């Protein structure tokens, strides 16, 4: 964890303690955190409100059987924690390809923004028909649809995490 040029922590910093350390730093105005299942179950989120919550996966059975989480429905209850603290005027960004995640759309406050690779995904198509916001990949470019307009943002291959567009699971998330 770094703030400006100063390193605060080294190692696995995805838990609530790291979030608290960052938020308490006097130079921090905004931050992005990973709120994983383990940290949420052990100590909570590490923050009590947020402007944006992003939920990428539940239905793939990742981490089931750990920490007494046996079913996707139980994991839903853990992962919705971030959605529950979105402020009014904020947003919850949800993976349309995971039906359990997409089911979080009506929960809490803030706008639900759905994302998927396929612009023809039924939930993306519905969101676009309603003039709501959706994010998808079209012709190799990450695109945001809102209010009947499609705005190309960046070619997938230019996003470092996708390794030139060759890491499909990173593109999906």
Regions found by a protein language model. Name each.
Residues 51-173:
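Acidic, Mg2+-coordinating active-site environments of NTP-dependent enzymes
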């Amino acid at each position: 964890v770094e703030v400006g040029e100063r390193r605060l922590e080294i190692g696995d910093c995805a838990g609530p303690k790291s979030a608290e350390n960052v938020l308490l730093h006097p130079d921090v105005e905004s931050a992005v955190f990973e709120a994983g299942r383990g940290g949420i179950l052990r100590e909570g989120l590490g923050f009590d409100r947020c402007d944006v919550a992003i939920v990428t996966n539940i239905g793939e059975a990742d981490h089931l059987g750990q920490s007494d989480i046996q079913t996707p429905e139980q994991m839903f209850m853990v992962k919705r924690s971030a959605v529950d603290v979105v402020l009014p005027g904020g947003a919850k960004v949800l993976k349309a390809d995971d039906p359990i995640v997409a089911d979080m759309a009506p929960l809490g406050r803030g706008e639900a923004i759905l994302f998927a690779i396929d612009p023809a995904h039924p939930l993306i198509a519905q969101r676009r028909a309603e003039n709501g916001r959706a994010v998808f990949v079209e012709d190799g470019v990450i695109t945001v649809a809102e209010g009947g307009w499609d705005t190309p943002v960046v070619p997938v291959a230019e996003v470092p995490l996708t390794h030139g567009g060759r890491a499909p699971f990173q593109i999906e998330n």
